[in-house]
Amino acid sequence: MTNAKTAKFAWNEENTQKAVSMYQQLINENGLDFANSDGLKEIAKAVGAASPVSVRSKLTSAKAYQKSDKPRKVGGGSSIRKAHYVRVIAKHAIDSGIIKDADDLASLESAKLETLDAVAQLLGVADEVKQAAGE
C-alpha cells in the first residue's frame, strides 16, 4: 500500500481551451444535444475533469456553452396537473350554468390527483383534460 496522493484536477488555460475546442467540434459533428450530454462526459475524460457538470460550468464561464433550444422533461411523472382538471371541470360547470365563476371550484385543487382523474372520467372530460395539458 502506498501513500502517494494523486494530484487534484485544476482548470487552466490549456485544458480550458482543449475543452472549448472539443465542445465546438462535437457540436459540428454530432449536434448540440449530443455535445450537451455524452459530449460533456467525453470532454471530462479527455481533460481529466471530475465530472461533466464541471465541464459544463467551465464552458459556461468561458462563454462557449450553448443551451439546448428544446426543453427537457424532468422526472417521469405526468405533465397533467390538478389545475388542468379543475379548469376543465369548472369550464363545463360554467357552460352548464351550475356555477358563475371558476373560483367557485378552486378548492378542488386540494383533492388528490387520482380523485380528480376519477371525477373527470365520470364527467366524460378526461380526454379534454389531457388536451388542455398538452398530452
UniProtKB/Swiss-Prot annotation:
This gene is part of the long terminal repeats present at both ends of the viral genome and is thus duplicated. Keywords: DNA-binding, Early protein. This is Protein A2. Belongs to the T5likevirus A2 protein family. Induction: Expressed pre-early in the viral replicative cycle. Expressed with a few other proteins from the first step transfer (FST) DNA. FST DNA corresponds to the first small portion of the genome that enters into the host cell at the beginning of infection before pausing. Involved, together with A1 protein, in the second step transfer (SST) which allows the completion of viral DNA into the host cell. Interacts with A1 protein; the two proteins form heterooligomers. GO terms for molecular function: DNA binding. It comes from Escherichia phage T5. It comes from the Viruses.
